[in-house]
Amino acid sequence: MKNVLSIQSHVIYGHAGNSAAVFPMQRLGINVWPLNTVQLSNHMQYGHWAGSAIDAAKMEQLVDGIAAIGALKRCDAVLSGFLGSPPQARAAVEIVRSVKAMNPNAWYFCDPAMGQTGGIRPEPGVEEFMVQEMPALADGMSPNHTELQKLAGRRIETVAEAVEACRALIRRGPQIILVKHLHDRNSPADRFNMLAVTETEAWIGQRPLYAFPRHPVGVGDLTSAIFVACRLRGDSVRAAFEHTLAAVHAVVKATYDARRYELELVAAQDEIARPSEWFGAWVTDA
């Protein structure tokens, strides 16, 4: 069984960061080692919250503890999400390097959270670190549309421009770019677009877009987690992309149908493992 170290925020109530990522990856057959960068009562969109961030040095100490018992060499991948400060981002880099030193076959997937995540906004300097440092280290990245524009340093309005931006990013280091949410001026307003790009291929997929009164938090964290889990279990990029598209849709639909604000992860757990509705991805020649 594969093991992933997941470095993200955490909420006690609800689903965001590791609280949205850990269970779906486990449901897909992956052992998850959660390292919480932030511990909050709930995500901040509620308007009231309690909690705090973990010290960056403590992050490294915790991973050193795993290494001390001889377990770090069994880590097959690192997934990072919200990193709240430049010291936390630097700690994540050192952790990835430690994992790869122990297991040269381990890979790193970076969800480059640069904007507001569950009401939390990273400190100044994190965005610059993500843009300048992370692409050279990451084996894969999963920006949303806004984050892709920041990484590429350009405005993106079409699928062709997005593919071009992803390929430019790939030339800096990553092998795979998963665009969790792509705005395309040519797409219907009721469709949600995702894009997966490698050096030689690109796939686009669409799922229904639901009109929530308040959009649930954690969908991006869920998306990255499912994609990483599918890749870890051996799925091809396209198969992982299609499974992610279908599984995330199932969770979002279950949440919408239940009229809930928090993601219905437990209710939709069978759909995460075996989605009943598939949308398929098609190759884009953009």
UniProtKB/Swiss-Prot annotation:
Residues annotated to bind ATP = 111, 147, 180
Please give the cofactor(s) recorded in the UniProt entry for this protein.
Mg(2+)
Keywords annotated in UniProt? ATP-binding, Kinase, Magnesium, Nucleotide-binding, Transferase
Q: In which pathway does it act?
A: Cofactor metabolism; pyridoxal 5'-phosphate salvage; pyridoxal 5'-phosphate from pyridoxal: step 1/1
- Give the residues the record marks as binding substrate: 9, 44-45, 221
Could you tell me the superkingdom of the organism this chain comes from?
Bacteria
The Gene Ontology CC terms held by the record are: cytosol
Query: CDD domains, from UniProt?
Result: pyridoxal_pyridoxamine_kinase
Specify the signal sequence span. none
Protein name according to UniProt = Pyridoxal kinase PdxY
Gene that produces this protein: pdxY
